[in-house]
């Protein structure tokens, strides 16, 4: 069994998602939410403040495509909390998280599993392989979405970038999973839809790689992965992983 541990990206690999964070309706709704809690934001003012605070927390971090620099990750709930405090409301973290979840629900146009996603994970676990999630994601959004999609119990471990302060392609994020789970790199494979973050990032720490070009993959040349799928086909991914 070559691939004893299978590491997956989430969005664009197992789950298809579309969010719209620029719609006037979203920011009008969120301004109403803040006003109900005593924070009198106007929609355009709120959006501008949100973007400013995100930028401040990111601290000018390099873009996801630059694999030569570290890639810090923020905790988005801090932004929602700061938006209350800028209007004089001493909001606790529980309210900030609930506000963040409302933002995510309102900005998500759809989220759904790709065909065969759950079946793939179940088959790998039934075969005795380790199944792990390593995703650039905000924990307050993604843990709720994993529960809604029924994926949480299908992983042996879930690693979300906002919990660790760094994100793919930063080698530290991959190494955290390998170290904490005592996984030798030569026994593991990374499956993802992003050539820079998933594939080249994984290769820097010695992982095998499977690339899937999905509907939300970055527009980039096909990467030099061990296996390259030019279209979404999780049944083919299952065959690759189970046969190795």
Regions found by a protein language model. Give the residues of each.
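Asp-based, Mg2+/Mn2+-dependent phosphohydrolase catalytic module
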Residues: 1-6, 16-20, 35-44, 94, ...
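Basic, amphipathic juxtamembrane/active-site segments
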Residues: 21-34
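A metal-dependent, Asp-based hydrolase signature
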Residues: 31, 44-101
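Surface-exposed cleft-lining segments at the edges of enzyme active sites
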Residues: 102-111
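A short, well-structured juxtamembrane/interface segment
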Residues: 113-117
